């Protein structure tokens, strides 16, 4: 009799994905973020489910229902701050995961990569809609500003914005539909994660050298299960430290003021994980141009596989490309900082320069440097 693990229709799928899966023997801790993202998604769905049991999506009561969760529900404050800071952990892991893919050439698995980019968009949309739900000042004005960007689309823009709002401003209808979508999207994301893994398991994992590791594979369990558990413990420690010691560190104090359409906050800004994109949006003086740059800042990931001109897959043995990669990282950190600053003299010009640098590195310099390195390797 064969083992149930290998014969049962459902269990054998789990077995071939998490137990007997052949994995390269040399994948580093940068390969931990996939499993951490899975845990983040599960945590967000779970805490979100319990929050939704006590939340009301009505403009009159939304803000008070969140206060009620924090004050009156048993451990409601833990749920709320786990959910809010869990989103931050989610994005930290996401950006590191994408950065790993760029550095080690994992984008050469185009199907896996493209689904990953769509997943990134979906998670960003979900996070944006979630930020609107507490109905504080930043929730309301963030929703107003970001949905208004769609009015830059020629001809249909204004109608589109009013259709999304369900009226002539962000109001009751908007909040209700955002709650509905915020609840629905994570389950769609979970389904897409399945497809992401399905495509990954067609090819197997990449590794730090970028050279096929077929000759040297080890079973996923116990080696990488224990390694993933270590990563999980570190992430949970960081998350709990944040939640229990300074839960509002990454939040905006303005969101503790109930939404007021008659009073605009002095500095409207999104959560920290969108600041780089917000800075790119603001650095272009034209509305439509800014919106295009905002979308392209993420969409550019789709064309990365097309711009791969190197004979080597990974950047491990390409010092010039490494310099560009870390310059890109520095430029994104700079944009994140500038996105949180007011629109004043030094920040505007620096933001424009960083934006141009980001696009230039990703779209032109990487491809040219790789071509140059091919000749260096020959010498």
UniProtKB/Swiss-Prot annotation:
Positions contributing to heme b b566 binding: 97, 196
An example Gene Ontology biological process: mitochondrial electron transport, ubiquinol to cytochrome c
Cofactor(s), names only, from the UniProt record: heme b
Family matches, as PROSITE patterns: CYTB_CTER, CYTB_NTER
Family annotation (InterPro entries): Cyt_b/b6_C, Cyt_b/b6_C_sf, Cyt_b/b6_N, Cytb/b6-like_sf, Cytochrome_b, Cytochrome_b_C_euk/bac, Cytochrome_b_N_euk/bac, Di-haem_cyt_TM
GO molecular function, one term: metal ion binding
UniProt subcellular location: Mitochondrion inner membrane
Extra information: Heme 1 (or BL or b562) is low-potential and absorbs at about 562 nm, and heme 2 (or BH or b566) is high-potential and absorbs at about 566 nm.
Protein name: Cytochrome b
